[in-house]
Amino acid sequence: NWTDTFKLFGIKRYAQFISNGSLNKIIEGEGNFREKGEYDLVIVDEAHNFRGATAGRYDDLQLICKTPRINEGLVKGHHKKVMLLSATPLNNRPTDLLNLLLLFQNARYSTIEGIQNLPVTFSSWIEDYDKLMRERKLDKHNERNAVFAKRTDELYEQIRTQVIDKVTVRRTRNNIKNVPAYKKDLDDQHIVFPDILPPKELMYELNGGLNDLFYSTMAILTDTPHPEDNPTGKGLHYARYRAVEFLQGEARKKYPTALHISTMLTGIYRVHMVKRLESSFYAFRRSLHTFLRITEDMIKMFDQNKVIIAPDINVKDKQTKGWELDRIIEYAVEKGLKEEDTVFKDEDFNERFLEMLKEDAKNLKELCKQWDEVSEDPKLELFIDKLEHEFFDKEINPTGKLVIFSESVDTVNYLTEQLQNRLHRHDILDVCASNRTNRQDILRKCFDANYAEQSDEFNIVITSDVLAEGVNLHRAN
């Protein structure tokens, strides 16, 4: 918690804190934020969130970082100090690393020793990496995994020694333990780094019919047809997220990056569906029914000859709430959108688009039917068995506390309900983005090893990735 940490060190009054999604407020002068030139030091936590240069928030952050300082103060020069914090600086593509460097470096006049032009320096690494990934994709049977791993390591070693080491202040656990001054400071404060054991997989089994359904479903989710890359694909088109790609004539000119947008959205939703299937059958069923509903809603738009494309107003949400199309159009116009840029007719689309929507709806209906008939949940059964007979063994868990992470909020809710009902435990706390603020105090009392006022009211916390970064949960062994 940055606010608490700055307060602890007595420097909170010198700082302002802002979330990634609100950077535009500084640019546009909204709220109580200072002018972008008034900041002397910019600290970016979890900097990997800015490795993609296409998002608007990247541009906002880069502008804030590179706007000259208005007041020099005791530190001379107009350039700001920029600190990017990341636990895994090399866990990025070369393109991502270049984007991060360009948040605080001049592209063609870098201050990094031995490197003047960053894009030129990175171009060969990016080319080698992309070539390596293409070759790896063609290796269908993973016969050259060791070769690819070796070549990737060699590539990143070059980037590390020539660039990353020169701009990185390392503070790894080994670094701190092996420097005498740091080690003494740890000893004086009675701080001990625990030895982290490697991950331990728990393998659950699917019976014959469920196993077949799982893998046939995975094929439908991933075998997306494509005229060039996968012409014989039998899976979902994800057409609901590709509307702009199939605009034609004058309508298409309004979306010059249509292919890029649809490719990106298709990839995101495909990964989302696969992750939901692997997370829990409950979460996957919910996603299936949602995907079917929004696909059928778009087909209904064609029936009314009014297809709305307006990402800024969340058309899907409005349809879920029962809004008529005319009301959604009026709402879009009220928000400053032009009707001619928002509402399209049947003839504005390639006829193949509606066919793809109907094919998706057919596949999704069948998947919904098949998964609605599944009552067993072997993953849950194995997990409950481990909870009852292993996870709270004093030999491996002397504190009797447990943290359970899931990428899916639906899985968090499902798991919380199942464990409370079946194990009759009342010490289970669920934490997601929607309730984190309200539960912060009790969470810290029960799980933060540094918190003065400790409690054992809750011994299990089930959470989404909202607690995966920057939160002390060390009472959970």
Predicted regions: what they are:
Residues 1-120, 355, 359-477:
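ASCE P-loop NTPase motor core, strongest for the SF2 helicase catalytic module
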Residues 17-50, 54-80, 84-87, 96, ...:
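Inter-lobe coupling linker of SF2 helicases/translocases
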Residues 185-206, 228-460:
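Conserved Helicase C-terminal RecA-like lobe
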